[in-house]
A protein has these predicted regions:
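HotDog/MaoC-like acyl-thioester-processing domains
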Residues: 91-92, 102-149
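Residue-level preference for beta-strand/loop junctions
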Residues: 16, 30, 77-79, 93, ...
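Hydrophobic residues in beta-strands and at strand termini
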Residues: 36-38, 87, 101, 145
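Hydrophobic residues positioned within well-ordered beta-strands of beta-sheet architectures
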Residues: 34, 81-83, 97, 122-124, ...
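Hydrophobic beta-strand-centered segment that forms part of the acyl-chain substrate-binding groove
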Residues: 64-105
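Non-catalytic linker/capping segments at the edges of enzyme domains
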Residues: 1-35, 39-40, 74
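Hot-dog-fold acyl-thioester-processing enzymes
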Residues: 37-62, 74-77
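Short structured motifs
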Residues: 18-22, 81-87, 109-111
């Protein structure tokens, strides 16, 4: 995948993600932003469901790595290996997410590993935001890229 249109089509093809109304909101080659409506992600308390926060953060990081690989001409299978999410406060509005590579991830070494061994791992970060851009949750995840069959 190389474009936001392709990424959005991929998200729409996954029934749980489509139900959440997640769509891309921006991509600058380094950071990916997503958004989703409160109405599709509301819980019994009238706030965003915690699982929706975890999902949009994971999908932002997954999408970022997928797009960065696509920009390198690489079609890989990307998987989340493990992740952590810290909830900072409830959200009673539409949600957003922004993902980027952790500063400790050496992109050139990642690409070298993938090209030589057919697999590589990267640490990604994301934040879940309110409509004004304030952070309501912080995500950290380790992702694996495997050579596509």
């Amino acid at each position: 995948m190389k474009t936001l249109e392709e990424l959005d089509a991929c998200y729409r093809a996954m029934p749980p993600v489509a139900a959440m109304g997640i769509e891309s909101a921006g991509w600058d080659g380094q950071r990916l932003r997503l958004r989703a409506p409160l109405a599709a992600n509301i819980n019994d308390k009238g706030t965003v469901f915690g699982g929706s926060m975890a999902s949009i953060a994971t999908l932002a990081a997954w999408g970022l790595l997928t797009l960065r690989l696509g920009a390198e001409g690489i079609k890989a299978e990307v998987y989340v290996a493990d992740s952590q999410l810290r909830y900072l406060k409830p959200l009673v509005a539409d949600l957003g997410a922004e993902a980027w590579l952790d500063e400790g991830t050496d992109w050139d070494a990642f690409l070298r590993s993938y090209r030589e061994r057919g697999r590589a791992r990267a640490q990604l970060l994301a934040r879940v935001t309110d409509p004004e851009g304030a952070t309501v949750a912080e995500f950290s995840g380790r992702f694996a890229a495997l050579r596509a069959p």
